[in-house]
Each structure stands twice: as structure tokens, then as C-alpha cells.
């Protein structure tokens, strides 16, 4: 049709069409209804409109929308370079090596950049810890940089409430705090050696300063278990590619573990097909209270309560000839032994594969179970073959809950003048230590929060400082096996934020 006409107009040949009886009758009530629904365009519904006029209006609106969207393209502030590098073609994606850190473990990644803007995060195929594997969390990490809910500027408390501030004023406040002393830092745990060096400098140069760490999800029981056995915390590094028999006591190494990517790759390499010339049929035993990924692929899965795992571990230790530590012996003395025949079969399987077996305990188990599991690994000859140990960062650090208690005691005794919180939200996810963390932070004369979001903790601090995303900053970290990985920025900070290194540097300068 070249024209859209009212059904009452008969100036053209053809059958008149209508959508309802009211439209066909063209009553005053129908016209009033249309006027109410389309007040500015009601006359157009009853008069002919040419296709040319319709396309003209639509073309103008499309051009206007395209013009408005194109207004931002020439802005170059967020590009990491002022001029295009030689040999770089616009529109061709480029990948850069960097690292992404989660739960105090850095993973090597390849970040794809499109015309100076990072758009994708994948595993680095040249990194030895996971050989290019990736997780959903790793790939989704790029979305945090473009999150419109990110904090975009510093703010501080005034007589009228929270007001925006600039970084010059914030840096001045940080330097004043460093000169005054009595600075306490509560930070998220990190494997960064650069941040560790800055931490040591803060403790050395700022009078009466202290450093504390907190994370709601941690592996403190594993650290304490190795400390009980070896005298200092160690990090167990498993090699599932050499484990003919794997026993998981409430552990999920294929999913719920910082090194799950490497574990999955190693385990899959050992489970070769029976059609191969020399098939390898490794065996997995899983004792757990909740179905996990590892339990789902296990050859034998034994359901058990989490509270029963120490008793089962003690039975395995007795069957393999390992002496129980006094703490574990006291914990399981009153518990009756399991009557499940598969526990004895598991112990026999371990003894028949000495040097090619491995036991792992989950992070929900107490430190005594971890110590017992490592003692069994040593007795069964796993160390040096299916298991090794690496040094951990800040081995002298106490457990997270004990560190919170130490900080709360310092605040209560008036030993903290400035509290700097970096990448943590204790008001939301930390347990109360006598008082809520909202009240504890309120007792400190000066409180400053550095984070990606203006969250619950930022709301009770006197200062909130917007933090850079990991794609906007320099840094470093260590993978689970101790491999050092460097971080490089893919883009200039979108909101002129600062990293933890820059903020601590301002305090000690």
C-alpha cells in the first residue's frame, strides 16, 4: 500500500479494512479513546499518510539516534595510547597476557582488546598452571570493568552528609594519616609480591601501624593443618596426572578448589580410553556430604556427614599404619568406627598403590583432619610423586578470624587513629567481634575505604575511594603452584581510580 487511509474514506478502490467494530463505527467515544492513548498523534490515525512522509520521519529519527551514539566515538581519554601503534589495524582484536586473582591465587589470562577496549578474558595457553583452561568467573570478570554500578569518584563525609571529592584531597588525607601514625589496614588477602613489599614498608616506616587480612571464603584450616605437621604453613600442590588412586575426604578438587583447572586437566589426562593400547584406569574415591563435581565422576562415592569425616580419616590412618595426632585421637575417641566395608576397601586400595596414590581433604574440615591427611600422604610415599609443597605468602599471618579479633582489640584499646580498608566489606560479610563492624569502624577517628563499589562498609566510613579494576592496573601475583605472573593494564582507568599499591604508597610517602 502506498497510503494508509481511514476506513471511512472511499477515495480509493478496494475493500475497507478495520480492526474493531468501534473503529468501523468511528464513534466519538472511539476518537476520545485514541486521543487519550496517543494525544499528539491522534489526527494522523484518521488522515492519509504517504509512505514517503513516513520514511522521511523514520529516517530522521534513525539519523538522530546514530548521530547521538556517534558523539562519543571521537573521545579518546580511555584509550591506553595517544596514537595508534605502528602496524596496528583498526577493528582487529589484539590479545595481551595478564593475570586475574581470586582467593589469593593468580591465574594467567589472555585479554582480548578491540580498538583499545578489553572485551574478553580467557586462560593463557602458555601458563603452566592451567594451560589455557578457563572458568565462568574468569570470563565474566571483564563485565566488572564496565559495570555502571561501579564507584566513579571519591567521596567523604561533610556536615551535609556524603559529598564528592577529588583525588588530590584524598591523597592529602592519606599522607596526613601516614605522618600521624597508628594506621591499621584491613585488606583482602593477595599473592602479590609488590603489595607484600609495600606492606612491609608500611609496617617499618609508619609508627604503630598494623596489617590485617580478611576474606569470607578462605582455606585457613588447610594452612593450620600443614603448620601443625611441618611447623609452618605450606601449600599442597597435587599432581592428579600421577595419581592412580585418589581419595577425597569432603573435597572437590575438580571444581571447588583454587587449582581446579589444573586438577581437571591432569585428571582427564589419566583417564584414558579402554580402547587405547595401554589403557589407564585411575580410581577415584569420594567421601562427602553433598554431591559435588568430583563425587559425580567418582568410581566409588560414599555419602557421609561432614562431622563423620574425621572419624573416617582416623580409620584410614589406622589401617595404613599412621599414628593419630593427639588432637585427632581425642576428637574421634568416643565415636564408633564406620561399619561401611568400603572404608576398608579404600584403605586396601591406598596400601596397594603406595607412591601412586593421593589423599585430599576439603576446606570445611578442621585443621586436625588436614594434618592427618598429609601424614598419610607422607606414609604412603605420595610426597615427591603425586604431591609437593610450596611456600605460602605471609606464612606468619594468623587465621582470618583471629586477625579480625586482633584488629578489634586494637580499636577497642584506642590504638588505631586511621583505619584503611582495601577491597573488603566487613560490615556485610565479617562476623561481629563483640560489636558489629559498623560500630567498630565508627569508633575510629579516621576511616577510609578503597573499593570498586560504594558498598555497606563505604557507607559507614568517612572516606570512600574508587578502586581500579584489575584490567586497569599494574600488578603481579602467584599461582597455586607458586608460578609468578605479571599483570598489565589493558586500558587507562575509566573513572580515574587508584590501585591498592598506589594508595599504600601515598600513606608511606
Residue ranges and their predicted role:
Residues 1-337, 344:
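N-terminal export/assembly segments and adjacent metallocofactor-ligating motifs
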Residues 165, 169, 177, 208, ...:
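Non-catalytic alpha/beta scaffold blocks inside enzyme catalytic domains
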Amino acid at each position: 500500500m502506498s497510503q494508509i487511509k481511514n476506513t471511512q474514506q472511499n477515495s480509493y478502490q478496494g475493500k475497507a479494512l478495520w480492526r474493531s467494530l468501534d473503529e468501523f463505527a468511528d464513534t466519538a467515544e472511539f476518537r476520545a479513546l485514541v486521543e487519550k492513548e496517543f494525544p499528539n498523534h491522534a489526527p494522523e490515525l484518521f488522515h492519509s499518510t504517504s509512505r514517503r512522509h513516513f520514511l522521511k520521519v523514520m529516517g530522521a529519527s534513525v539519523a538522530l539516534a546514530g548521530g547521538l551514539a556517534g558523539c562519543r566515538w571521537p573521545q579518546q581519554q580511555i584509550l591506553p595510547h595517544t596514537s595508534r601503534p605502528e602496524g596496528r589495524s583498526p577493528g582487529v582484536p589484539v590479545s595481551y597476557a595478564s593475570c586475574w586473582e581470586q582467593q589469593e591465587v593468580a591465574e594467567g589470562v589472555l585479554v582480548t582488546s578491540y580498538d583499545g577496549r578489553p572485551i574478553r578474558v580467557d586462560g593463557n595457553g602458555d601458563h603452566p598452571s592451567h594451560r589455557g583452561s578457563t572458568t565462568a568467573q574468569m570470563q565474566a570478570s571483564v563485565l566488572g570493568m564496565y559495570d555502571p554500578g561501579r564507584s566513579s569518584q571519591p567521596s567523604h563525609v561533610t556536615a551535609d552528609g556524603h559529598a564528592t571529592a577529588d583525588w588530590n584531597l584524598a591523597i592529602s588525607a592519606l599522607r596526613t594519616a601516614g605522618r600521624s601514625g597508628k594506621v591499621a589496614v584491613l585488606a583482602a588477602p593477595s599473592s602479590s609480591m609488590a603489595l607484600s613489599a609495600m606492606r612491609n614498608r608500611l609496617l617499618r616506616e609508619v609508627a604503630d601501624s598494623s596489617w590485617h587480612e580478611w576474606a569470607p571464603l578462605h582455606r585457613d584450616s588447610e594452612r593450620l593443618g600443614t603448620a601443625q605437621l611441618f611447623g609452618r604453613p605450606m601449600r599442597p600442590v597435587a599432581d592428579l596426572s600421577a595419581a592412580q588412586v585418589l581419595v577425597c575426604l569432603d573435597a572437590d578438587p575438580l571444581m571447588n578448589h583454587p587449582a581446579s583447572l589444573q586438577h581437571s586437566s591432569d585428571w582427564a589426562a589419566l583417564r584414558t580410553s579402554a580402547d587405547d593400547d595401554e589403557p589407564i584406569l585411575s580410581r577415584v574415591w569420594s567421601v562427602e556430604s553433598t554431591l559435588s563435581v568430583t563425587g559425580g565422576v567418582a568410581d566409588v562415592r560414599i555419602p557421609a556427614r561432614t562431622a563423620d569425616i574425621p572419624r573416617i580419616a582416623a580409620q584410614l590412618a589406622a589401617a595404613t599404619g599412621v599414628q593419630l595426632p593427639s588432637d585427632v585421637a581425642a576428637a574421634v575417641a568416643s565415636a564408633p568406627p564406620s561399619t561401611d566395608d568400603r572404608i576398608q576397601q579404600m584403605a586396601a586400595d591406598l596400601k596397594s598403590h603406595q607412591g601412586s596414590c593421593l589423599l585430599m581433604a576439603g576446606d570445611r574440615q578442621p585443621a586436625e583432619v588436614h594434618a592427618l591427611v598429609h601424614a598419610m600422604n607422607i606414609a604412603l610415599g605420595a610426597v615427591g610423586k603425586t604431591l609437593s609443597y610450596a611456600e605460602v605468602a605471609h606464612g606468619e599471618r594468623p587465621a582470618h578470624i583471629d586477625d579480625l579479633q586482633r584488629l578489634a582489640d586494637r580499636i577497642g584499646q584506642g590504638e588505631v587513629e586511621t583505619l584503611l580498608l582495601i577491597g573488603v566489606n566487613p560490615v556485610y560479610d565479617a562476623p561481629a567481634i563483640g560489636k558489629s563492624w559498623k560500630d567498630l569502624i565508627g569508633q575510629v577517628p579516621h576511616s577510609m575505604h578503597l573499593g570498586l563499589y560504594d558498598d555497606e562498609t563505604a557507607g559507614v566510613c568517612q572516606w570512600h575511594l574508587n578502586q581500579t579494576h584489575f584490567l586497569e592496573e599494574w600488578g603481579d601475583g602467584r599461582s597455586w603452584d607458586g608460578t609468578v605472573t605479571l599483570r598489565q593494564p589493558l586500558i587507562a582507568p575509566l573513572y580515574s581510580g587508584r590501585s591498592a599499591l598506589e594508595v599504600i604508597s601515598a600513606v608511606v610517602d
